[in-house]
Each structure stands twice: as structure tokens, then as C-alpha cells.
Amino acid sequence: MSPTQEQLIALGGVFQAAVLVDRIAKTGQISEAALSCMLGSLLVVDPKDTLDVYGGDDLNLHEGYRAMASALERDPATLQREPLRYALSMLGLERQLAKRDDLLEVIGKRIPVIQSQVEHFGIAHENVIAATGALYQDTLSTLRQRIQVQGDMRNLQQPNNASKIRGILLAGIRSARLWRQVGGHRWQLVFSRRKLLKELYPLLHG
């Protein structure tokens, strides 16, 4: 797997999270498989490669790849505006988080606790969803930059949906951190669009 492919997979995780957050906000529903993949990505500590973080299957990131492609193509007809805004916000929040050792320490201590809950209840159980949402609130929600989620207030005000959104945002920011760790930089999204698209299309249509 090339370095660019590794970066695209991690960035696909960011965009996948963004698409799912947008869907919960607007419809109140996402599949359990999609939720499980994103929350599960928080718990993978020793992946053999980047795709392993997302269950080892590109299909798990297909919607994220599609949203990323529309952003890189800059086609107004297909551009998913809200997911793009969320994805860019997650990249920005990750940069802020990287400077906060205290928050990283909190996350590092609480992820194993969530892992033990998963072993007891299962990944998509409401207790696990609540725990990931609370971890986001206690760490990333304290930063100056906030992600403003737009959608139907009836969906956003349901506690379980709010926890799902926060948990998925946490997973998206974990993906943003992974993207940076495998060599991703924001300038690539501006200056290397064609190269990224050339390597993204096989992932999207594979």
C-alpha cells in the first residue's frame, strides 16, 4: 500500500464520520454497522495497516470516499457541503488537540475503560455510545473551536443521537490524527488534488 493510499484511507475515515454525523442530524438514523465501524476505530491500538483500523474493508469507508471525491473534484453539483465543513473542522480540532497533552492523557486513560464496556455490552450498546459521547464532551468540547452540527432539532435533541454524533466526531478526529501520522497535510488538499483523486478512484470503485 502506497503512502498516499494510507493517507486517503485515514482521510476517508474523517469524511465517513462527517457523512454519518450529517445523516444523524438530518434523519436521526444510521446503520448499526456504520456506527460500529466508526466507534470500533477508536479502540484499534496496534493495526497492521491503516485499513485495519476500519475493519480491513474499503466498503466500510465508501461513503467517506465519495464525499472526499466530491470535495476534491470541486463540482458544485455533487459537493456535500455539510460533510465537507465537518471534515475540515475535525482536521482543525485535531491540530488543537495535538497541543493538549492533558486532554490526550484523559483520552488515553478512558479508551481502555470503553474497551472493557464493549467486551461486556457490545460496540453499539447505548452505554458504549454514551461513554464515547461523554469522552468527547469532556475533552474536545472544552477547546475553543467547536463543531456546529446543523440538522433537525428533533433529532439533535435526542440524547442517544447527541451521544452518537459526539462519539462519531471523536472517531473522526482520531482518523484526522491517523492521517497526520501517515504523512497527511492540509496543503495536499489544495495542491495535490489531481494526484489524490487518481489514487482515490480505485478505492472508490474497487
From Swiss-Prot:
Record carries keyword Transcription: no
Source organism of the structure: Pseudomonas syringae pv. syringae (strain B728a)
Domain of life: Bacteria
Gene symbol of the encoding locus: hflD
Subcellular location: Cytoplasm; Cell inner membrane
Bilayer topology annotation: Peripheral membrane protein
Keywords: Cell inner membrane, Cell membrane, Cytoplasm, Membrane
Name of protein: High frequency lysogenization protein HflD homolog
Listed InterPro entries: HflD (IPR007451), HflD-like_sf (IPR035932)
